[in-house]
């Protein structure tokens, strides 16, 4: 089960919804492919991600596409063993302003059955804010 929480602006009440995420290892176990379905802001949501560890660069790399837009988000970052997390940094084109914006994603392993993803990006004032949180719980 995936619990989604989204914030439109700092201090505003969040929007919550649920969905399903299916992860599978592909191409000889080199890549994790994620398929996500649910509702977001009252609309059907579908997204696909690919996460991999680049042995040459020594970082994780992630790509993401969904039905809320037409762009592809690319992010990369290191694993932190002390916090059991990956901090991914990347850019995405804002469809409203047609300018590239910085985004940050923190992906944490809570335990064997729970993972947490937090997405940060620019708010209306241009300052970084927490935009989304996804809590993934393994189906038993």
How would you describe each model-predicted region?
Residues 1-140:
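Hydrophobic small-molecule pocket/channel-lining residues, especially in calycin-type beta-barrels
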């Amino acid at each position: 089960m995936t619990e989604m929480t989204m914030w439109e602006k700092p201090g505003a009440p969040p929007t919550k919804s649920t969905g399903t995420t299916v992860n599978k290892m592909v191409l000889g176990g080199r890549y994790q492919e994620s398929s996500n379905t649910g509702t977001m802001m009252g609309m059907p949501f579908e997204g696909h991600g690919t996460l991999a560890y680049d042995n040459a660069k020594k970082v994780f790399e992630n790509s993401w596409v969904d039905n809320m837009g037409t762009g592809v988000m690319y992010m990369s970052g290191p694993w932190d063993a002390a916090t059991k997390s990956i901090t991914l940094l990347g850019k995405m084109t804002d469809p409203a302003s047609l300018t590239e914006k910085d985004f940050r994603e923190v992906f944490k392993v809570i335990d064997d059955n729970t993972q947490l993803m937090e997405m940060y990006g620019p708010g209306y004032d241009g300052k970084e804010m927490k935009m989304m949180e996804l809590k993934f719980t393994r189906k038993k």
